[in-house]
A protein has these predicted regions:
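Active-site helix of classical SDR
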Residues: 111, 147, 155
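Alpha-helical segment proximal to the catalytic Tyr-Lys
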Residues: 116, 160-161
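Active-site loop-to-helix junction immediately N-terminal to the catalytic Tyr of the SDR YXXXK motif
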Residues: 86, 136-145, 157, 185
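Residue(s) in the substrate-gating loop at a strand-loop-helix junction
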Residues: 130
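Substrate-binding pocket helix/loop in short-chain dehydrogenase/reductase
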Residues: 81-88, 92-97, 189-190
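A glycine/serine/threonine-rich, flexible loop-to-helix segment
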Residues: 31-35, 84-86, 164, 171-195
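Canonical Rossmann dinucleotide-binding motif of NAD(H)/NADP(H)-dependent dehydrogenases/reductases
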Residues: 1-20
């Protein structure tokens, strides 16, 4: 609905692809995207039942057809009260679960649920991980970073499992991109970096 996801939708749409979007937000009325509202699914990826319902909705919209690409881009990185990163010492278990459901488990549910449509198209899955999954990051919290590292490992497993079906699975790991996932205090943190 914004950031990398929004840019991805714009890119695929401009290339003539039919794009079915998923977001926790309703489709914005002021969005100029012509097919947007009818091809938008509001879903809470932190809720497994909601995610499964979204898979059923996507399959219904595809009407048993093909799915050329699945881009698993959802990601959340909760911050502390003052915008600071949450570490392993101060992230409560509920937050860990919430982050992993959105950033990791939803990718499994979506890919498995859409396996037949991906196979019919000999399509591709792209999991959006993060550089934060490979190193301690000054902005990204421990749960976010760990979930993105797990998603990178999952990508290898999915490539092994989906490959024989003719479905490619890859990951991209973006670096710093100015999106809403960065906390409001990010500019102050950047000033303190010894670069």
């Amino acid at each position: 609905s914004r950031g990398i996801g929004h840019a991805t939708v714009k890119r695929f749409s401009s290339a003539g692809w039919r794009v079915i979007t998923c977001s926790r937000h309703p489709f914005p009325e002021d969005c100029p995207w012509e097919m947007g509202e009818e091809d938008h699914i509001q879903v809470d990826l932190s809720d497994p039942k909601s995610t499964i319902t979204a898979v059923e909705d996507i399959r219904e919209r595809l009407k048993g057809g093909k799915l050329e690409a699945l881009v698993n881009n959802a990601g959340i990185s909760p911050k502390g009260e003052n915008g600071e990163r949450l570490s392993t010492l101060d992230t409560d278990l509920r937050t860990w679960g919430h982050v992993f459901h959105v950033n990791f488990f939803a990718s499994v549910v979506l890919a498995r649920g859409l396996k037949a449509e991906l196979q019919a198209a000999q399509g591709a899955v792209v999991n959006v991980t993060s550089i934060a999954g490979a190193r301690v990051h000054p902005f990204a919290g421990a749960a976010y970073s760990t979930s993105k590292a797990a998603l990178a490992a999952l990508t290898r497993e999915m490539a092994h499992d989906f490959g024989p079906l003719g479905v490619r699975v890859n990951a991209i790991a973006p670096g710093e991109i100015e999106t809403d996932i960065l906390s409001p205090g990010t500019d102050k943190i950047v000033e303190k970096l010894p670069l």
